[in-house]
Swiss-Prot record:
EC category name: lyase
Name this protein carries in UniProt: Putative pterin-4-alpha-carbinolamine dehydratase
Species in which this protein is naturally found: Rickettsia bellii (strain OSU 85-389)
UniProt KW keywords: Lyase
EC number: 4.2.1.96
PANTHER family recorded: PTERIN-4-ALPHA-CARBINOLAMINE DEHYDRATASE
GO-annotated biological processes: tetrahydrobiopterin biosynthetic process
Gene3D superfamilies: Transcriptional coactivator/pterin dehydratase
Catalytic activity annotation: (4aS,6R)-4a-hydroxy-L-erythro-5,6,7,8-tetrahydrobiopterin = (6R)-L-erythro-6,7-dihydrobiopterin + H2O
C-alpha cells in the first residue's frame, strides 16, 4: 500500500545553502501539484497573482501569508496593490527552487479557500 502526502501536508525545511536547485523535471512535477495559476517566472521563481475586489482584502491576505511564513520559516516576496496580492517564492540561499517553495505555495492557496 502506498501512502501519498499532499504538498500542503508537508513542512518547509530551512535551506542552509550548498544544495542544487531543483531540475526542470522535478519543478514540472511539483508545479502540476499546485493550482493552475502558479507559474515559474522569468527569474525562475514561483509566481501567482491573487485577485480581490478591493484594497483591504489583499492586505488581510498578505497578513495571513506573513503569519504562515513565520510558522514555516520560509518567506515569500509579497506585492500588494488595489485588488491584488502578488506572491513570489524561491529559496534565497540558492537563488533557485526547492520542494519547500512548492510546499509554501500549496499552503498559501489553502489560506484563500
Amino acid at each position: 500500500m502506498t501512502i501519498t502526502c499532499s504538498l500542503s501536508d508537508k513542512k518547509c525545511i530551512p535551506c542552509e545553502g550548498g544544495v542544487p536547485p531543483l531540475e526542470k523535471k522535478e519543478i514540472d512535477k511539483l508545479l502540476s501539484e499546485l493550482q493552475n495559476e502558479w507559474i515559474v517566472n522569468e527569474s525562475g521563481h514561483l509566481y501567482k497573482k491573487y485577485k480581490f475586489p478591493d484594497f483591504m482584502q489583499p492586505i488581510e491576505f498578505a497578513n495571513k501569508i506573513a503569519a504562515l511564513a513565520e510558522q514555516e520559516v520560509h518567506h515569500p516576496d509579497l506585492t500588494i496593490s488595489w485588488g491584488a496580492c502578488i506572491v513570489e517564492i524561491w529559496t534565497h540561499k540558492i537563488d533557485g527552487l526547492t520542494e519547500s517553495d512548492f510546499i509554501l505555495a500549496a499552503k498559501i492557496d489553502l489560506l484563500q479557500n
